[in-house]
């Protein structure tokens, strides 16, 4: 369009354009009538009620940084307990990994009456007052004097003795750290025993060989948690320390099959290699030479996890190999072990283990748990706060409950004898290829 055409356009339509502008301004700036205001407000209220909207309008002063709500402050902090074991570094504990419903706070607290004591009698299970050193402030006395049985709050038995007759309101505690496949007790009636003191977690007096804690925030670790140079120096496959050669689980059969795909050095009475018990060099070579440690149990029973896993498997820089995932997973750190039932065949497992040996980055991922968790090994010879949440201290705690907490194993056979797999069930189910 030329300049002349534009000039003619405005000359012809200028009055109409001026009128349109005036009309527009009147519409925009003219005041709303009272009836219109009422209609508008009613519509707003109706909308608010229909949708239940209640949105506060923040003034400028409410937006100042120091007045903004802190979401971290609103999240309740979990209570932690400080563990200060003898001769070791103290650490804060947020929770213990267990299948039991008894929380850590309950485990760590006893309602003690000043000036009074509670009595624990070992009828034929051994032990001594030293086993209560994890909770000396709970005022429990340990005795092996059978004449004091009528006064005992709890009585430990390792096998039946007809001379012992339980009293009402008295806990009968069965002590055993052996697999149900290799141990047992003949009892006069199915509900004779109140609780067990041993590897089982589903009992108030559970006393495993070790346990895992989730660390409190102050005790968690940052940065590198494993020595990369140590891992890079490893060259061998797996080590196995074993003296029980024929077992219910048939673990020896699986190891023989796996040896076709992975180097497994067998130490002890069941293999050609020797390493004396208690020799520190044995632990050192697990750190420096081997990638994996065989922790297969002699039988597959509920909660049955022994010192093989807790000591050599987790106190060294090595990945433990276990038989069945569901038996150990509730009690150990996440992504910290390898189970044979994770694989479709023996060969598939061997291939994966060889892959980890050749991929140190993937191998080291199995130690990431050390940032947030700690594994405690209970060797049975040192008694301190590490034992407080378990075993004898928990029998002591139960003895202080008022009214006396009712605990009962209603069917002993179902609880003990019927919790093991038939011999070789798992091993026989895994094909070679």
UniProtKB/Swiss-Prot annotation:
It catalyses: N(4)-{beta-D-GlcNAc-(1->2)-alpha-D-Man-(1->3)-[beta-D-GlcNAc-(1->2)-alpha-D-Man-(1->6)]-beta-D-Man-(1->4)-beta-D-GlcNAc-(1->4)-beta-D-GlcNAc}-L-asparaginyl-[protein] + GDP-beta-L-fucose = N(4)-{beta-D-GlcNAc-(1->2)-alpha-D-Man-(1->3)-[beta-D-GlcNAc-(1->2)-alpha-D-Man-(1->6)]-beta-D-Man-(1->4)-beta-D-GlcNAc-(1->4)-[alpha-L-Fuc(1->3)]-beta-D-GlcNAc}-L-asparaginyl-[protein] + GDP + H(+). InterPro entries: Glyco_tran_10_C, Glyco_tran_10_N, Glyco_trans_10, GT10-like_C_sf. Changing residue 243 to A: 85 percent decrease in catalytic activity. Keywords: Glycoprotein, Glycosyltransferase, Golgi apparatus, Magnesium, Manganese, Membrane, Metal-binding, Signal-anchor, Transferase, Transmembrane, Transmembrane helix. The C-terminus (424-433) is important for catalytic activity or for enzyme stability. The N-terminus (1-78) appears to be dispensable for enzymatic activity. Glycans are attached at residues 194, 359. Optimum temperature is 23 degrees Celsius. No detectable activity at 37 degrees Celsius. Its cofactor is Mg(2+); Mn(2+). Residues 1-12 are cytoplasmic. Belongs to the glycosyltransferase 10 family. Residues 33-433 are lumenal. Can also use Co(2+) or Ca(2+) in vitro. This is Alpha-(1,3)-fucosyltransferase fut-1. Pathway: Protein modification; protein glycosylation. N-glycosylated. Glycosylation is important for enzymatic activity. The record marks 243, 267 as: May be important for donor substrate binding. Its EC number is 2.4.1.214. One of its GO terms (cellular component) is Golgi cisterna membrane. Expressed in the pharyngeal-intestinal (PI) and anal valves. Expressed in ASG neurons and in one or two neurons in the retrovesicular ganglion and two neurons posterior to the PI valve and PHA and PHB neurons in the tail. GO terms for biological process: carbohydrate biosynthetic process; fucosylation; protein glycosylation. Preferentially catalyzes the addition of fucose in alpha 1-3 linkage to the first GlcNAc residue (with or without alpha 1,6-linked fucose), next to the peptide chains in N-glycans. Unlike in mammals, does not require the prior action of N-acetylglucosaminyltransferase I to generate complex N-glycans. It is found in: Golgi apparatus, Golgi stack membrane. The lineage of its organism: Eukaryota, Metazoa, Ecdysozoa, Nematoda, Chromadorea. One of its GO terms (molecular function) is 3-galactosyl-N-acetylglucosaminide 4-alpha-L-fucosyltransferase activity. It is an enzyme of class 2 (transferase). The chain crosses the membrane at residues 13-32. It is a single-pass type II membrane protein.
């Amino acid at each position: 369009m030329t300049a002349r055409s534009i000039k003619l356009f405005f000359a012809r339509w200028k009055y109409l354009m001026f009128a349109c502008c005036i009309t527009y301004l009147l519409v925009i700036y003219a005041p709303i009538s009272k009836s219109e205001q009422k209609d508008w407000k009613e519509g707003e209220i109706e909308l608010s009620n229909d949708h239940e909207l209640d949105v506060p309008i923040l003034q400028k002063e409410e937006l100042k940084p120091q007045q903004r709500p802190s979401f971290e402050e609103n999240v309740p902090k979990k209570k932690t307990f400080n563990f200060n074991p003898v001769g070791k570094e103290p650490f804060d504990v947020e929770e213990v990994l267990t299948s039991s419903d008894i929380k850590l706070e309950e485990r760590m607290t006893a309602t003690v009456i000043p000036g009074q004591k509670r009595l624990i009698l070992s009828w034929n299970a051994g032990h001594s007052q030293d086993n209560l050193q994890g909770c000396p402030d709970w005022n429990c006395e340990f005795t092996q004097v059978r004449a004091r049985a009528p006064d005992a709050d709890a009585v430990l038995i390792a096998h039946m003795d007809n001379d012992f007759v339980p009293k009402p309101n008295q806990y009968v505690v069965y002590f055993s750290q052996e697999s149900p496949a290799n141990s047992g007790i003949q009892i006069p009636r199915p509900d004779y025993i109140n609780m067990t003191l041993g590897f089982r977690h589903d009992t108030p007096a559970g006393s495993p060989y070790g346990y895992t804690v989730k660390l409190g925030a102050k005790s968690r670790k940052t940065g590198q948690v494993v020595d990369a140079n140590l891992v890079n120096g490893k060259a061998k496959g797996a080590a196995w320390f074993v003296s029980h050669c024929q077992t219910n689980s048939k673990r020896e059969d699986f190891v023989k099959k796996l040896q076709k795909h992975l180097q497994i050095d067998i130490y002890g009475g069941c293999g050609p290699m020797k390493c004396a018990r208690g020799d520190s060099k044995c632990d050192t070579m697990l750190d420096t030479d081997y990638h994996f440690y065989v922790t297969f149990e002699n039988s597959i029973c509920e909660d049955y996890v022994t010192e093989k896993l807790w000591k050599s498997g987790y106190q060294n820089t090595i990945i433990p190999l276990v038989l069945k995932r569901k038996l150990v997973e509730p009690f150990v750190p996440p992504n910290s072990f390898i189970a044979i039932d994770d694989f479709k065949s023996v060969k598939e497992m061997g291939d994966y283990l060889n892959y980890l040996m050749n991929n140190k980055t993937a191998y080291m991922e199995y130690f990431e748990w050390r940032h947030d968790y700690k594994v405690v090994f209970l060797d049975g010879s040192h008694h301190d706060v590490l034992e407080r949440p378990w075993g004898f201290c928990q029998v002591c705690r139960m003895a202080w409950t008022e009214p006396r907490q009712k605990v009962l194993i209603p069917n002993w056979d179902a609880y003990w004898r019927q919790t093991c797999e038939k011999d070789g069930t798992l091993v026989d189910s895994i094909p070679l290829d």
